Amino acid sequence: FYPTPPEIAGKLLSGVNWDHVESILEPSAGRGDLIEYALRRNGSSRNHRYCRRDLDDIDCVEIDSNLRAILIGKGFRVVHDDFLDYYTRKRYSLILMNPPFADGDKHLLHALELCEHGGQVACVLNAETIRNPYTNSRKLLSRELKKHGASVRFVSGGFKHSVRKT
């Protein structure tokens, strides 16, 4: 579990177009840092629909039972434990994620499957996953990102001030 540093969350969320966000998923949610940052950031905007009372539109997935308990205690709906075997008919307009770097490619590919047409996925990944597509899943991810016209930004040292270092 590597909490997303606020600086990285800010950069990740700066690229989100909130105009058409109807549903949010945070897979591998940890303590819900990304979604909480998004709520704080947008809660001050009068015309933004997300605030504490709208948590019915937000789903979280978390494999660690202690972290699931924290999410539930914060009022978040936890819909599943292992994101890689989370299947639902629901499609999300926004997926915010900081998946485990070891399987980041698989997590991002699965997120693309759960994203509605025209939706957005904002993801923190190890740069090596993108720069070195040596596995079949990384090659597929590279093709999918090109197909979707994904915007990729590389941030050096993004986790050097985090609670847990990468």
List each language-model region with its residue ranges.
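Class I S-adenosyl-L-methionine-dependent methyltransferase catalytic core
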Residues: F1-T166
